[in-house]
């Protein structure tokens, strides 16, 4: 199976400007690039599709490039936005780009270039003369993402973004023999601008490999962008998102959607190999074979086997009722999505008063009944005496209360 058919079968490709040129670009080992926006300090789970596809394209024979938007990030891409993006300062974009560069070096196996290098020594007059002349205003006004913003207002900076990204493609074409640009489905307008600028400068006959392709937007069954939990984006930086949260997010995806995710994310295994896994999953959905496979796969890919081992340890502690095996920090991660009550560690509590303030039940009568039934545990210890004094260590960050088999209540200690 050729690589285009492979990516289509996996539901990755949305649009290709010219399939014949794309096949020729591979045959002649031309360059392909994907751009990465440094508006945040880390890549997130949604960025993994272009990263994994870039790795795949290198494997099949393309020369691959990852372009950091150190220049374009200073303006902000208006694609898919209904209002003006907040401008970030140079220092912040530069710091973000440096952090993301480290991630791209780890994940992409591509040559990494910051597009700020294209513009630092360029003056405005040369840009308008050499690049601005390649595009007319009518062409830009026909772009859907610009047309949709005209009525509500769009700054000249964001209006010009399309030309600047087009110039990126032109520069890479001239300096690195990059013939293919890839991006999310919202990048189609920017990609085609670059193609048209290069064709206008060099002509159709001299651009036999020039093309672009976009990836299908990854939406969950509710129609929301995949890669965002209730707590926000799931970052690849473990200091921003603990690997356990990524594992849990993947593990909790529904049975049909997880199949689509496996097809898109696991490009280092053939569709035939993956089909065996999927059939085993469909034969016994309760075991969640597919969810566990992809959760393990992505945590190991993003982080390491050691991180995955820690995630497994945290899961085991939770399900085997051995939370004492975890540090307070690990407990905070495990219960990140749970509601929490803050209490003063310097305050003295009897167990029943503590449970009432932790909102385990609405009354002391109900709490006494639960304790008599053996249904209350505090930090893995079964409670038998509602009048006992609660002991809190000076360095203790939280207390975990378990009611019954599955209901948890979290108290965070302050003071």
Curated annotation (Swiss-Prot):
PROSITE patterns listed in its UniProt record: AA_TRNA_LIGASE_I (PS00178), S4 (PS50889)
Pfam families: SYY_C-terminal, tRNA-synt_1b
Keywords, ordered alphabetically: Aminoacyl-tRNA synthetase, ATP-binding, Cytoplasm, Ligase, Nucleotide-binding, Protein biosynthesis, RNA-binding
One MF term in the entry's GO annotations: RNA binding
Domain S4 RNA-binding as annotated: residue spans: 350-414
Residues spanned by motif 'HIGH' region: 38-47
Principal place of residence: cytoplasm
Binding, ATP: 228
Keyword ATP-binding annotated: yes
Positions that bind L-tyrosine: 33, 161, 165
Location in the cell: Cytoplasm
Cellular-component GO terms for this entry: cytosol
A GO BP entry: tyrosyl-tRNA aminoacylation
Broad class of enzyme this protein falls into: ligase
EC numbers, comma separated: 6.1.1.1
Residue positions of motif 'KMSKS' region: 225-229
Family statement drawn from the similarity comment of this UniProt entry: Belongs to the class-I aminoacyl-tRNA synthetase family. TyrS type 1 subfamily.
Free-text function comment from the UniProt entry: Catalyzes the attachment of tyrosine to tRNA(Tyr) in a two-step reaction: tyrosine is first activated by ATP to form Tyr-AMP and then transferred to the acceptor end of tRNA(Tyr).
Assembly behavior: Homodimer.
Name of this protein: Tyrosine--tRNA ligase
Native source organism of the sequence: Mycoplasmoides gallisepticum (strain R(low / passage 15 / clone 2))
């Amino acid at each position: 199976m050729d690589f285009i058919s492979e990516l289509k079968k996996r539901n990755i490709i949305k649009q290709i400007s010219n399939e014949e040129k794309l096949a020729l670009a591979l045959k002649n080992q031309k360059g392909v690039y994907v751009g990465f926006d440094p508006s945040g300090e880390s890549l997130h789970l949604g960025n993994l599709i272009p990263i994994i596809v870039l790795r795949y394209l290198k494997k099949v024979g393309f020369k691959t490039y990852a372009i950091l938007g150190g220049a374009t990030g200073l303006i902000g891409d208006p694609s898919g936005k209904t209002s003006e993006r907040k401008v970030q300062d140079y220092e912040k974009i530069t710091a973000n780009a440096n952090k993301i560069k480290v991630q791209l070096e780890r994940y992409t196996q591509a040559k990494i270039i910051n597009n700020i290098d294209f513009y630092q020594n360029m003056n405005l007059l040369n840009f308008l003369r050499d690049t601005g002349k390649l595009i007319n205003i009518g062409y830009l006004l026909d772009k859907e993402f610009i047309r949709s913003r005209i009525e509500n207002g769009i700054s000249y900076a964001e209006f010009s973004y399309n030309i600047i990204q087009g110039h990126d493609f032109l520069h890479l074409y001239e300096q690195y023999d990059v013939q293919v640009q890839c991006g999310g489905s919202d990048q189609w307008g920017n990609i085609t601008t670059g193609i048209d600028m290069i064709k206008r400068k060099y002509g159709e006959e001299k651009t036999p490999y020039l093309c672009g392709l976009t990836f299908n937007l990854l939406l969950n069954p509710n129609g929301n962008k995949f890669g965002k939990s209730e707590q926000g984006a799931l970052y690849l930086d473990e200091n921003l998102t603990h690997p356990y949260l990524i594992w849990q997010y993947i593990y909790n995806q529904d049975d049909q959607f997880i199949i689509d995710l496996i097809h898109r994310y696991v490009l280092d295994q053939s569709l035939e190999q993956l089909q065996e896994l999927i059939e085993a999953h469909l034969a016994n959905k309760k075991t969640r074979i597919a969810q566990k496979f992809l959760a393990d796969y992505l945590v190991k890919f993003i982080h390491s086997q050691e991180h995955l081992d820690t995630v497994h340890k945290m899961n085991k502690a939770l399900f085997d009722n051995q939370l004492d095996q975890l540090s307070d920090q690990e407990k905070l991660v495990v219960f990140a999505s749970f509601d929490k009550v803050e209490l003063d560690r310097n305050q003295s509590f009897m167990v029943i008063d503590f449970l009432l303030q932790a909102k385990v039940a609405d009354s002391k009568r109900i709490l006494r009944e639960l304790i008599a039934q053996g249904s209350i545990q505090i930090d893995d210890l079964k409670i038998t005496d509602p009048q006992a004094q609660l002991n809190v260590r000076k360095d203790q960050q939280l207390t975990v209360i378990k009611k019954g088999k599955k209901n948890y209540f979290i108290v965070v200690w302050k003071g």
